[in-house]
C-alpha cells in the first residue's frame, strides 16, 4: 500500500485492524500512506469497530455486503450518508423473514435476510435464506436514493447463542469490548454447561 500509493482498501474489517497494527509496527508514519477510504465486509462488524478502523488508519470506512451464492461482493453498498446499505434490488428481491416461523417480517423488523434473483439466467435462486440477521428500510435515503436499505448485519441465525434463555450475538459482545480502551478487538467466547447452568467465559 505504501509503495503503490493505494487510496482504497478492500478487506474484512478485522484484517484492516491487523494491517493498522502492522503499519504501526513497521515504523512508517501513517501520513506517508495515501489511503482515503475502505470498503469492508465478509464478516459482521460494529459501529465501534468502524470508529477504531477510521481512527487507526485515518480513512472513511464503508460497509459492503455480498455473498457468493447471490453475486459475490457488490450485492449492496453504503452510500456517503451511511444510513444503511443500499441493496441492488433491480437484480435481487430482498425480504426479511422470521427465522423460526419463516413468516414475512414487518418493515424495520429484524429477521433473516432472504434473496430471490431477478436477472440471473443460470441457476437463479428463489427465496434463498442467507442466515444473516438484519432489517430492511424502504423510506427514501437522505442521499436521494430510493433503493431499499439494510441495517448492519447483527449476526447469523446459526451464530446466535442462547444463554440462560437470553439470545446473545457475538457482535453485541464485541460492541461492548471495543468501548473499553484496555481491550483489543480479538476475543474468544467459551460457552459451557456446568451444574445444569449455561456459562459464558470471555
Where are these regions (language model features)?
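Active-site glycine/GP-rich loop and adjacent strand/helix microenvironment
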Residues: 1-202
Amino acid at each position: 500500500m505504501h509503495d503503490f500509493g493505494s487510496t482504497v482498501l478492500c478487506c474484512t474489517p478485522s484484517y484492516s485492524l491487523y494491517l493498522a497494527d502492522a503499519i504501526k509496527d513497521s515504523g512508517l508514519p501513517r501520513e506517508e500512506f495515501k489511503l482515503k477510504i475502505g470498503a469492508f465486509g465478509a464478516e459482521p462488524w460494529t459501529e465501534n469497530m468502524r470508529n477504531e478502523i477510521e481512527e487507526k488508519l485515518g480513512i472513511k470506512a464503508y460497509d459492503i455486503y455480498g455473498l457468493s451464492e447471490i453475486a459475490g461482493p457488490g450485492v449492496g453498498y453504503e452510500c456517503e450518508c451511511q444510513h444503511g446499505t443500499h441493496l441492488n434490488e433491480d437484480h435481487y428481491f430482498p425480504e426479511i423473514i422470521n427465522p423460526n416461523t419463516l413468516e414475512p417480517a414487518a418493515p424495520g423488523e429484524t429477521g433473516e435476510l432472504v434473496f430471490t434473483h431477478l436477472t440471473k439466467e443460470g441457476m437463479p435462486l428463489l427465496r434463498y435464506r442467507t442466515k444473516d440477521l438484519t432489517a430492511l428500510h424502504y423510506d427514501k435515503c437522505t442521499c436521494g436514493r430510493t433503493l431499499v436499505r439494510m441495517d448492519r448485519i447483527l449476526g447469523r441465525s446459526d451464530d446466535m447463542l442462547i444463554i440462560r434463555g437470553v439470545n446473545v450475538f457475538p457482535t453485541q459482545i464485541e460492541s461492548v469490548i471495543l468501548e473499553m480502551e484496555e481491550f483489543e478487538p480479538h476475543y474468544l467466547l467459551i460457552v459451557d454447561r456446568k451444574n445444569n447452568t449455561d456459562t459464558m467465559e470471555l
